[in-house]
Amino acid sequence: LANVVGAVHAAVSAEVQDRGGAVGAFVGDGVLGVFGLPTAHDDDPERALGAARAILHRVEQINSTLGVRFGVSIAARIGINTGEAIIGNNGGDIFFDYTGLGDTVNTAARLEGINKYLDTRICISGSTHDQCPSILTREVGDVILKGKKDLVQTLEPLAENHRGAEW
């Protein structure tokens, strides 16, 4: 299992970094990808969606090779939220932990978690959808996420409008 998780971590890291993002943390088999760090781009939400699509493809490849070899399968689930976050060293003087904190990051993590209940692989928030006009989506609904008082608009990306490419 460690070999497969390691391969997934490497693939996710590469896809995030190839699109101008950074890896903020590895937590178990999960990865926090942050866009707008170290350099912000006007299209960071679209870059995150592109990375998500590529990550799903890479995980399928890993499952068909290493997964078969070791008898395991990784189910990739991705949550994307757009907004401001606190970025910096959250580890103190002894342990360096350069990552993102705050409601934006927490909401993305909660969106990742609800995929298994919604039978989706990528969930995005309304704030991400608003920044990605070229992406066709399916409205999943307004949901109450753990730790949130207000409903969060949740959507599933389906395709890019201008190309009709399938997700």
Tell what function each PLM region has.
Residues G33-V34, V72-G88:
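A short glycine-enriched loop-to-beta-strand structural element that forms part of the catalytic core
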Residues S13-V16, A54, T107-Y117:
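Substrate-engagement module of ASCE P-loop NTPases
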Residues H9, S13, L56-N63, E84, ...:
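Structural signal for well-ordered, non-membrane alpha-helices
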Residues D18-V27, R58-G79, K116, V143, ...:
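Catalytic core regions of nucleotide second-messenger enzymes
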Residues L1-R53, Y98:
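Catalytic NTP-binding/metal-coordinating core of nucleotidyl cyclase/transferase enzymes
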Residues L32, A48, R58, N81, ...:
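Key residue(s) within conserved catalytic/signature motifs
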